[in-house]
């Protein structure tokens, strides 16, 4: 009886280890799907494979990433622009949780389609922080973002997770 009880406890412990391991792996994948891939390489621009939907009135496009630098000096984003893009503005922000680290408005007229849009940042003390790149507008802009769908990362449009990453890079030291 005592031996049988030990065997049962051993089996229960083994099953518990397997279940906990599975839950841990599943939660990591689920976290990645909701928040983007924590290992997303933001030190280089990704090659675009598609274009996002247009950034219009009230649209909020977000990409989560872990900052590899203590100081972010520059942010580079590749936009796509329609022929009828107007003179409206787009807001580019970096958030640390809900706290804004950086925010700048850019005139759509100053953006060249499918070229690097360089934005000076100068924010410090960010190495290892989970940041969110947020791109939004209060008006219809005629702008979209270049997207690399061949990554395991996810970006969000108005809270909906979509496979891929915005074609952007962060430079600093």
Regions found by a protein language model. Give the residues of each.
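Beta-sheet-rich sandwich/jelly-roll-like modules and their strand-loop junctions
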Residues: 2-99, 109-130, 136-173
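Short hydrophobic alpha-helix segments
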Residues: 104-106
């Amino acid at each position: 009886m005592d031996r049988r009880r030990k065997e049962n406890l051993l089996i229960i412990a083994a099953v518990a280890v397997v279940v906990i391991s599975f839950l841990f792996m599943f939660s990591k994948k689920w976290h990645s799907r909701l928040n983007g891939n924590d290992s997303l390489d933001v030190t280089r621009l990704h090659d675009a494979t598609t274009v996002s939907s247009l950034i219009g009135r009230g649209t909020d496009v977000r990409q989560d990433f872990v900052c590899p630098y203590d100081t972010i000096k520059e942010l580079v984003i590749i936009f796509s622009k329609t022929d009828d893009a107007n003179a409206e503005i787009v807001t580019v922000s970096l958030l640390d949780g809900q706290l804004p680290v950086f925010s700048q408005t850019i005139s759509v007229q100053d953006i060249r389609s499918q070229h690097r849009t360089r934005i000076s940042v100068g924010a410090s003390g960010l190495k290892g922080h989970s940041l969110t790149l947020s791109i939004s507008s209060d008006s219809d802009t005629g702008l979209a973002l270049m997207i690399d769908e061949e990554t395991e990362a996810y970006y969000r449009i108005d809270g909906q997770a979509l496979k891929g990453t915005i074609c952007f890079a962060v430079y600093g030291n």
